[in-house]
């Protein structure tokens, strides 16, 4: 497998995210979304000989890049798993409750988006796939070919926040009865015609494609599972930094952290005797939500929607 796919990726909030982890030279850290290794390389540069870094990714190309890095640096290990499974991985390695910091950089990477053969983009024609790991799960084409119109509309609306979801789903089903969808450009054209009110400066297929990608990869389900697993994996004083790129992701992260800041009392029945510690917060927030600087926005326009939230485990 070729390590350098020819598509560049500029790591978003690179310095800010690594700084947020408050690295210890001998700490054990976890990069839940290795990608092309931007964050991981910077973390490794700040760790001492006893420091360790464990990387996760589903994408075979990312794994190839990670394996090359692991061959260069014995402090680093890469595993081909979703960060939703980090709990099982750290348990197998005897690291549960011992991880010093965890970073999650959510969403699709530039190499995935820019490579037409991955099928993520409506701008460049390619096979309608959209899977982070092309060897697992069903492709976007398979979903579109078999799902009922109501399910397609739900995906467009719930995950893409597309207000014309029903109309676009009906257009998709009407067309697939004549000819199946196999290419991204083909689907994008049908969605374009079915969208009566394009947003200025935005491709009419944008939201529907986002919805499909999130559904095919179970991105929100993985995020919810990954956040819970991350909290259990962290040691007391360990930090969790999460970078999200759209409101659905950020809402999940924000609500998760808000719940833990309040403690567990809100989830208990009224008038039930409880120990005092359930009223105590499990985490504390580190600063406010962070966004890309003006300089980063100019250098990398894709960073405009990035928001990072950071928390520290208290108990």
Swiss-Prot record:
Which keywords appear in this protein's UniProt record, sorted alphabetically?
A: Cytoplasm, Methyltransferase, rRNA processing, S-adenosyl-L-methionine, Transferase
Q: Where is the signal peptide?
A: none
Instruction: Tell me the domain of life.
Output: Bacteria
Q: Where does S-adenosyl-L-methionine bind?
A: 37-39, 57, 83, 105, 112
Q: What EC identifiers does the entry list? A: 2.1.1.199
Alphabetically, the GO molecular function entries are:
rRNA (cytosine-N4-)-methyltransferase activity
Q: Which portions of this protein are annotated as coiled-coil regions?
A: none
Reaction(s) catalysed by this chain's protein: cytidine(1402) in 16S rRNA + S-adenosyl-L-methionine = N(4)-methylcytidine(1402) in 16S rRNA + S-adenosyl-L-homocysteine + H(+)
Its BP terms in the Gene Ontology are: rRNA base methylation
Pfam families membership: Methyltransf_5
* UniProt entry tagged with the keyword Nucleotidyltransferase: no
Q: Where in the cell is it found?
A: Cytoplasm
A Gene Ontology CC term for this entry? cytoplasm
Which family, according to the similarity comment?
Belongs to the methyltransferase superfamily. RsmH family.
* Cited function: Specifically methylates the N4 position of cytidine in position 1402 (C1402) of 16S rRNA.
**UniProt-recorded name of the protein:** Ribosomal RNA small subunit methyltransferase H
Organism, scientific name: Pseudomonas putida (strain W619)
């Amino acid at each position: 497998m070729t390590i350098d796919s020819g598509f560049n990726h500029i790591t978003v909030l690179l310095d800010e995210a690594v700084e947020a982890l408050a690295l210890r030279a001998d700490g054990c850290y976890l990069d839940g979304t290795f990608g092309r290794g931007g964050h991981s390389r910077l973390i490794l540069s700040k760790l001492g000989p006893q420091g360790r870094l464990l990387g996760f990714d589903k994408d075979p190309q990312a794994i190839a890049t990670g394996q090359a890095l692991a061959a260069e640096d014995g402090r680093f290990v890469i595993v081909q798993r979703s960060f939703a499974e980090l709990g099982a991985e750290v348990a197998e390695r005897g690291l549960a409750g011992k991880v010093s910091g965890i970073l999650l950089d959510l969403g699709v990477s530039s190499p995935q988006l820019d490579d037409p053969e991955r099928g993520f983009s409506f701008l460049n024609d390619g096979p309608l796939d959209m899977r982070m790991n092309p060897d697992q799960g069903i492709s976007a084409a398979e979903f579109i070919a078999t799902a009922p119109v109501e399910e397609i509309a739900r995906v467009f609306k719930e995950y893409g926040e597309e207000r014309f979801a029903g109309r676009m789903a009906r257009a998709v089903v009407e067309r697939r009865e004549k000819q199946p969808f196999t290419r991204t450009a083909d689907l994008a054209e049908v969605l374009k015609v079915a969208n009566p009110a394009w947003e200025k400066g935005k491709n009419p297929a944008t939201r529907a494609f986002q919805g499909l990608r999130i559904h095919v990869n179970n991105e929100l389900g993985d995020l919810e599972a990954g956040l819970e697993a991350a909290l259990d994996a962290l040691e007391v004083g360990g930090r969790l930094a999460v970078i999200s790129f759209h409101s659905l992701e950020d809402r999940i992260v924000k609500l998760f952290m808000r719940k833990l800041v309040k403690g567990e009392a809100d989830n208990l029945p009224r008038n039930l005797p409880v120990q005092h510690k359930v009223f105590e917060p499990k985490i504390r927030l580190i600063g406010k939500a962070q966004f890309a600087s003006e300089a980063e926005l100019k250098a990398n326009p894709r960073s405009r929607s990035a928001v990072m939230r950071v928390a520290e485990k208290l108990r």
